[in-house]
Amino acid sequence: MFATRSALFGFLAPAFLFSFAAAQQPTVASLAAPVPAQILTGQKVFISNAGYDAVSRAAFDRAHEPNRPYNDLYAAMKKWGRYELASAPADADLVFAIRFTSRIDSCDKITSYQPELELTIFDTKSHFALWTITEPVAGAMRKSTWDHNFDQGVTALMDELKVIAGTSTSGSNAKQP
């Protein structure tokens, strides 16, 4: 019985020490760089339509929705209410530039497209890009499926923006670019 307890103690003691040491290691989240202060403190945002590439333009024109990324982001931002929406860049603290692209992805002889929404946040004073969020939008053959996938992309983009804009200056909860 003494041998069993000694063996058990001999096994558990190092396991406990290693787990304690591991618990003391900084986590990835605690090492995250801070979110730029302008994103956290900004009050007014101008939403810019940064357009789309040629492939995407053709698709949006066929659907008679050439400004859909801009319109959907504008509506989502208005609904969220975190930032006041400015009518001119000069009146804003930040510019949110929305762009839609469909990168060509080639694998051997098969070519496909990878549609994505891209939101770049600019500081109006310095004109520097502070942050970029990119969210994929799954392709579709049917319009109803495309509408659903596009809405999911906008929702995912807004969810990530909310995490970034709602964090403390430590940035511990934000995904870094």
Residue ranges and their predicted role:
Residues 10, 62-68, 85-89:
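A generic short-segment signal for beta-strand/edge and adjacent turn/coil regions
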Residues 59-70, 110-115, 143-154:
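Solvent-exposed, acidic/flexible segments
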Residues 151-166:
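Two-component system phosphotransfer/interaction surface
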Residues 1-5:
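N-terminal secretory signal peptides that target proteins for export/translocation
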